[in-house]
């Protein structure tokens, strides 16, 4: 999850709940299922929390049919267009404690701490639709009911890029994931949060929000002999798919084309690699920068110069929504790819359509202009709309990330990472 203030968008989220897991020697596999629910989990703006967002177009800014009309709109006046955006979160079922208390948590490569809501947590409403005990609807933790619970009497405090936060105390207890049990796992038991569910951060130890480094889940899985390396692979599948997969300690060789290409991680705290250039429909943009590969971020973020070149290449135009936020739109039929060139001659090609999202007339009919799902930021982040086109292996031990073009298939050929 992007740990920096960013402009986010009103969202229909795709909540991905962990399906039954398969356990194999040397690795732990979790399969994810996709379902839609109306939330706006990445929206820090007050206006977006209160009402839907709109764009206004004049008739000259969109095509009309032979009669001079396009369903609901007259050529003589402007038209309001509703913004509906999707966010994707990847969640897994875990158990905590000797009594196997069940919780569902977001799996996040952009952070490093596991935290879960206490059974008496105070849920602080932040987004539209947050009511009652919304923050523990996916489960909560009762230390008193677990014989193996240990209160470390150390405070925990974390804040995410969308403005959500979690506060509590550090505990140790048994954590079950993917059919295995991790003993004495350190995590935060949270008594106050504005987030909708707990988060399982699986990044570097140095990225932990605590004042000291500890063994987070990937490290514990390795140290307790469950996996051979503190590493995991991520397969998000296609945008239309209903399943995805993360494998701790393993790689599915059936899920990518060609060979995996190793890239050194360029940060001590974040899972970043070097990006050399971006080619947009034949227009090359020098990047020479580091990018974070973040499963907890739905869209992608770049510095201003990269964003402007991408927008120009796809013919985007700037608009302002009803809350005053800057929005870029482009023809929904824009074809071609955006090619990301990394070191060691690795190229990942992403369809332009991955960076476009449908807008709608207020009647619900699709509008011919789509929102461009790229944002300006001081940091460069490749989110889910990039990661769906790549098979990514995060190796925390060897400080490298390996990637290859994704292959969408139901076939499987899993090997352990040694």
Curated annotation (Swiss-Prot):
Which EC class, in a word?
Answer: hydrolase
- Boundaries of each Peptidase A1 domain copy? 90-404
Catalytic-site annotation from UniProt: 108, 294
The effect of pH on activity is described as: Optimum pH is 5.0.
Which reactions are catalysed by this chain? Preferential cleavage at the carboxyl of hydrophobic amino acids, but fails to cleave 15-Leu-|-Tyr-16, 16-Tyr-|-Leu-17 and 24-Phe-|-Phe-25 of insulin B chain. Activates trypsinogen, and degrades keratin
Query: Which EC numbers does the record give?
Result: 3.4.23.24
Q: Which residues bind pepstatin A?
A: 108-110, 161-162, 294-298
Q: Which family does it belong to?
A: Belongs to the peptidase A1 family.
- Name of the protein in question: Secreted aspartic protease 5
Biological source species: Candida albicans (strain SC5314 / ATCC MYA-2876) (Yeast)
Give the taxonomic lineage as stored in the record.
Eukaryota, Fungi, Dikarya, Ascomycota, Saccharomycotina
Name the gene.
Answer: SAP5
């Amino acid at each position: 999850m992007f740990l920096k203030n960013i402009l986010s968008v009103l969202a229909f989220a795709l909540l991905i709940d962990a399906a039954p897991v398969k356990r194999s020697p040397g690795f732990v596999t979790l399969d994810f299922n996709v379902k839609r629910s109306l939330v706006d989990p990445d929206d820090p703006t007050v206006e977006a929390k209160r009402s839907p967002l709109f764009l206004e177009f004049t008739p000259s800014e969109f095509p009309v049919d032979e009669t001079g009309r396009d369903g609901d709109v007259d050529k003589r006046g402007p038209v309001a267009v509703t913004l509906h955006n999707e966010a994707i979160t990847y969640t897994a079922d875990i158990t905590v404690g000797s009594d196997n208390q069940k919780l569902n948590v977001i799996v996040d490569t952009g952070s490093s701490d596991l935290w879960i809501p206490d059974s008496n947590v105070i849920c602080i409403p932040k987004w539209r639709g947050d009511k009652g005990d919304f923050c523990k609807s996916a489960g909560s933790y009762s230390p008193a009911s677990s014989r193996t619970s240990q209160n470390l009497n150390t405070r925990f405090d974390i804040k995410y890029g969308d403005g959500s936060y979690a506060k509590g105390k550090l505990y140790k207890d048994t954590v079950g994931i993917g059919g295995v049990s991790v003993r004495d796992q350190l995590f935060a038991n949270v008594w106050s949060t504005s987030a909708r569910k707990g988060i399982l951060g699986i990044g570097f130890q140095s990225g932990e929000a605590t004042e000291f480094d500890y063994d987070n889940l990937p490290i514990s899985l390795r140290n307790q002999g469950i996996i051979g390396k503190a590493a995991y692979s991520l397969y998000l599948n296609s945008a239309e798919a209903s399943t995805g997969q993360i494998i701790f300690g393993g790689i599915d060789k059936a899920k990518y084309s060609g060979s995996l290409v190793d890239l050194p991680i360029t940060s001590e705290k974040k899972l970043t690699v070097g990006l050399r250039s971006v080619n947009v429909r034949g227009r090359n943009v020098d990047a020479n920068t580091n990018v974070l590969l973040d499963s907890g971020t739905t869209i992608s973020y770049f510095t201003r110069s990269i964003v402007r070149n991408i927008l120009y290449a796809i013919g985007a135009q700037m608009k302002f929504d009803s809350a005053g936020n800057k929005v870029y739109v482009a023809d929904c039929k824009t074809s071609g790819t955006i090619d990301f060139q990394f070191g060691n001659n690795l190229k990942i090609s992403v369809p332009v359509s991955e960076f476009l999202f449908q807008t709608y007339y207020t009647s619900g009919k699709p509008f011919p202009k789509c929102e461009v799902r790229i944002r300006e930021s001081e940091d460069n982040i490749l989110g889910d709309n990039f990661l769906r086109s790549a098979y990514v292996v995060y190796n925390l031990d060897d400080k490298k990330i390996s990637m290859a073009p994704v292959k969408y298939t139901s076939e499987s050929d899993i090997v352990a990472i040694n």
